[in-house]
A protein has these predicted regions:
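Conserved hydrophobic helix-helix packing surfaces used for dimerization/oligomerization
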Residues: 1-5
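Active-site-adjacent loop and "lid" segments of alpha/beta metabolic enzymes
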Residues: 9-10, 14, 460-489, 493, ...
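Cofactor-cradling patches in redox/metallo enzymes
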Residues: 17-20, 24-104, 110
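Surface-exposed amphipathic alpha-helices with a cationic face
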Residues: 24, 68-81, 237-241, 302-317, ...
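Short hydrophobic alpha-helical runs that function as membrane-insertion/retention elements
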Residues: 30-33, 53, 105-108, 276-277, ...
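Catalytic alpha/beta active-site cores
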Residues: 60-64, 106, 128, 138-429, ...
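C-terminal helical cap(s) of enzyme catalytic domains, especially alpha/beta-barrels
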Residues: 118-128, 360-369, 500-526
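Long, compositionally biased intrinsically disordered regions
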Residues: 127-137, 158-162, 166-171, 175-177, ...
């Protein structure tokens, strides 16, 4: 076929040059005219050449409709309109505008060359070829979980063996509730036994139908409308990473309303998020027992119930990874159970952070954590280990020592840990000027240190860039994107990001703020591609300092020969550093 390509533009003809390449490659005859060719000249040439297609491009928006209308009229007057197909494309073009002006077809921004070639060749566009294909990924694949330094392995073995020996004949209300709930889910009627182990808030809900403050039931009609809405949503998701397959990008949700959560998730999926994390209300961590049913909550945090989790799960794309947080409260084992039954892919367990900065008693959370790790192994739920005690001021070496203990403990119980250091501007960093020059070196040092000790996936959180964000949306998106680029440069497995209004939110988190950061990250990944960010020599110095600090902490804990006592006594972080052993659940552990 013969084509005349005409840039109806003073200077811009890049798109037509690219189209020329595609058409020539397909064996077509092409006449490419230069920019600023007069319409009269084009008409005269077309009368001589009699092309099958006249293809016009218009990049500049002003005056586009008038110029394009005039050109189609000139072709009509010359008798070419019925003999040639006339197609228009460019940033200023929409399909509706092309039809209105009398063109045979119009192609706007984001059109692929496959679509254009398919049109001129008279065939259907291969939709599957054009559609972005995402698949669910296993973050833990390819890792051995080997402790790479024998000296560290000796210490970690001693500490974790002591934990397992100590916990083997101890139980708690949470452990017993999880055992009961498992039987209830299999059909046994044990609600009375369950409620004997619950706080009055939970008992009143089941026996008196009294809802906790600011909690309401979701109606059947609301559920029906939700299902209809989710089914009606149809979009082609995006892939944020440019030429790399790491890191996966996770967003946090927990608006209080499962419906709102689902909509935030769908928007995040549409803009490229690979996974989502469920955050529950803070009061849920301090309440013995869990509620049931479809429930909405007026404040931050979405209530953990099997029904709520299943509702949210029903809204997820098949490729989206789903993590349910369970690591810091009085319902850790049961949360793992419900997450697994609802179809979660991942969970979150860290007894050290949960007891030093999460408000739960160390003895209680150690017992609960060991049982939770067993459940995670049984249900094949990889678990991440956030070192959020860093945000309270605990130095990274001590926080990492705790993380590695929990990771090695998980491996011994056949679970799959994911290391989660913080990419943050923590109090310890501020006090010691570790980031006085840049945010790169100390964060890189954390990764270098962990990779020297254990072969395990690394997923910085939560979110990356914490304490570097401000209320300015542009600044917030920028700092998140730069931290994401650093994670990409380090070839890390995943990252958790915040929306631009999340770190300093004084109200509801908005969907547009989620898009801010996802778009910024996509641009950062595109900008760097396979290129890497180069730290200064201080990164290696900091890394060695962190490794030494981890070893010293583990050595003290191993010598103490009592993990729980080490938590109480400040070996994983002192009160002066920001570690405050929790009180929730104190005195509830018993021998069994």
């Amino acid at each position: 076929m013969k084509f005349v390509l005409f840039p109806l533009d003073p200077v811009h003809d890049v798109a037509l040059k690219m189209l020329n390449r595609e058409l020539v490659r397909k064996g077509h005859q092409v006449i490419l005219l230069p920019p600023d060719t007069k319409m009269e000249e084009v008409v005269e040439m077309c009368q001589k050449e009699m092309p099958d297609f006249i293809m016009v491009s218009r990049t500049v928006g002003y005056g586009a409709a008038e110029l394009l209308a005039r050109f189609i009229d000139m072709l009509d007057a010359a008798g070419l309109r019925d003999r040639c197909k006339v197609v228009v494309g460019g940033k200023a073009i929409t399909k509706e505008l092309a039809t209105e002006l009398g063109y045979d077809a119009g192609f706007g921004e984001r059109t692929s060359w496959d679509e254009v070639i398919a049109y001129v060749e008279g065939r259907e566009v291969e939709k599957e070829k054009l559609k972005v294909k995402k698949s669910k990924r296993d973050i833990t694949q390819g890792y051995t979980y080997q402790i790479l330094d024998p000296a560290f392995k000796q210490l970690l073995d001693k500490i974790t063996d002591q934990i397992l020996d100590w916990a083997k004949d101890r139980t708690s209300p949470a452990v017993e509730r999880a055992k009961i709930k498992e039987k209830v889910l299999e059909g046994e009627d044990l609600i009375e036994e369950y409620l004997k182990l619950c706080d009055e808030t939970i008992v009143s809900y089941f026996k008196k139908n009294l809802l906790p403050k600011k909690v309401r039931l979701i109606t059947r009609e609301e559920r029906k409308k939700f299902d209809q809405l989710v089914k009606s949503l149809n979009f082609d998701g995006r892939i944020l990473r440019h030429t790399l397959d790491k890191p996966l990008v996770f967003v946090q949700y927990g608006t209080g309303c499962p419906f709102m959560d689902a909509m935030h998730i769908k928007v995040s999926e549409a803009w490229g998020a690979d996974g989502v994390l469920h955050f529950d209300p803070s009061w849920g961590a301090r309440c013995e027992g869990l509620l049931e049913g479809l429930l909405a909550h007026e404040e931050d945090g979405s209530i953990i119930t099997l029904e709520n989790l299943k509702l949210i799960r029903s809204s997820l794309d098949v490729s989206t990874l789903w993590c349910v947080r369970a690591h810091r409260g009085l319902n850790t084992p049961e949360t793992i159970l419900l997450a697994a039954r609802a179809g979660a892919d991942l969970t979150k367990i860290n007894m050290v952070y949960g007891s030093l900065n999460g408000g739960t008693d160390p003895e209680r959370l150690t017992v609960d954590g060991v049982y939770a790790l067993k459940l995670a192994a049984r249900y094949n739920l990889p678990f991440d280990i956030p070192t959020n005690e860093e945000l309270g001021g605990v130095p990274a070496p001590k926080a990492f020592a705790g993380m590695l203990v929990v990771a090695h403990l998980g491996v011994k119980l056949n679970a799959k840990p994911i290391l989660k250091p913080l990419f943050c501007y923590s109090p310890d960093v501020m006090i010691n000027d570790y980031m006085k020059d840049n945010y790169i070196d100390y964060n890189v040092a954390k990764v270098i240190a962990l990779r020297q000790i254990m072969d395990a996936p690394i997923w910085p959180g939560e979110p990356i860039g914490f304490m570097t964000h401000t209320e300015d949306r542009i600044q917030s998106a920028m700092t998140t994107a730069l931290h994401a680029a650093l994670a990409s440069s380090l070839r890390l497995d995943a990252i958790t990001i915040a929306s631009t209004d999340e770190a300093y939110a004084r109200g509801a988190i908005t969907v547009s703020a989620r898009i801010d950061t996802l778009r910024a990250i996509a641009e950062a990944f595109r900008f760097f591609g396979q290129a890497k960010i180069e730290p200064t020599k201080r990164a290696e110095e900091y890394a060695q300092m962190i490794v030494n600090g981890i070893y010293e902490t583990l050595e003290k804990v191993a010598k103490r020969e009592d993990f729980v006592a080490s938590l109480y006594e400040g070996l994983f972080g002192t009160r002066e550093e920001g570690a405050n052993p929790g009180r929730a659940g104190r005195g509830t552990v018993r021998k069994c």
